[in-house]
From Swiss-Prot:
Name of the protein: Large ribosomal subunit protein eL19
Modified residue annotations for Phosphothreonine: T187
NCBIfam families, sorted: PRK08570.1
Keyword Phosphoprotein part of the UniProt annotation: yes
CDD domains: Ribosomal_L19e_E (cd01417)
Family in the record: Belongs to the eukaryotic ribosomal protein eL19 family.
Keyword check for Glycoprotein: no
Annotated organism of origin: Oryctolagus cuniculus (Rabbit)
Positions where Phosphoserine occurs in the chain: S13, S164
GO BP terms in the entry: translation
Role noted for this protein: Component of the large ribosomal subunit. The ribosome is a large ribonucleoprotein complex responsible for the synthesis of proteins in the cell.
Record's keyword terms, sorted: Citrullination, Cytoplasm, Isopeptide bond, Phosphoprotein, Ribonucleoprotein, Ribosomal protein, Ubl conjugation
Description of post-translational modifications: Citrullinated by PADI4.
Localisation per UniProt entry: Cytoplasm
Length: 196
């Protein structure tokens, strides 16, 4: 059997692949050995004596299966961990995510007129100061603030109504007293006139 190194090299350059991917027909070695140019190699490829081997399968099925399992939390125990907690999930990244979520919520509430700009500003600073652990707590805080505000407004309205009521009552009382005084003065003046 003759060496077919040259033919393999020529075939790999024609097929534009590695020498490992070139298959030479073992039954036609003599014919292949005679070919010593690109043109002849092209003819052999056309005839099917030289073939480019298909790409070897590198399956990702196992990898996909493991990834799905990891999403559920499998294979993630203490024994599988190499880096520190901060290296695995940086504190800065979690902080940025939380800030973006909370600030987005505040912006949405301000745009939909659920909170005014003053409340927005104070809550924005509180968010920055790490007051709220998550979105739910911030929403509860906003609802509580709004409820307190509504309650204060109700109390203020009630107090105002009470004040106006007492004011009106005082005014009526004064009017009654004034009318009584005028009546008494009239009766006294009449009596004096009759005496004369």
């Amino acid at each position: 059997m003759s060496m077919l190194r040259l033919q393999k090299r020529l075939a790999s350059s024609v097929l534009r692949c590695g020498k490992k991917k070139v298959w030479l027909d073992p039954n036609e070695t003599n014919e292949i050995a005679n070919a010593n140019s690109h043109q002849q190699i092209r003819k052999l490829i056309k005839d099917g004596l030289i073939i480019r081997k298909p790409v070897t399968v590198h399956s990702r099925a196992r990898c996909r299966k493991n990834t799905l399992a990891r999403r559920k939390g499998r294979h993630m125990g203490i024994g599988k961990r190499k880096g520190t907690a901060n290296a695995r999930m940086p504190e800065k990244v979690t902080w940025m995510r939380r800030m973006r979520i909370l600030r987005r919520l505040l912006r949405r509430y301000r745009e939909s007129k659920k909170i005014d700009r003053h409340m927005y500003h104070s809550l924005y600073l509180k968010v920055k100061g790490n007051v709220f652990k998550n979105k739910r707590i911030l929403m509860e805080h906003i609802h509580k603030l709004k409820a307190d505000k509504a309650h204060k407004k109700l109390l203020a309205d009630q107090a105002e109504a009470r004040r106006s009521k007492t004011k009106e009552a005082r005014k009526r009382r004064e009017e009654r007293l004034q009318a009584k005084k005028e009546e008494i003065i009239k009766t006294l003046s009449k009596e004096e006139e009759t005496k004369k």
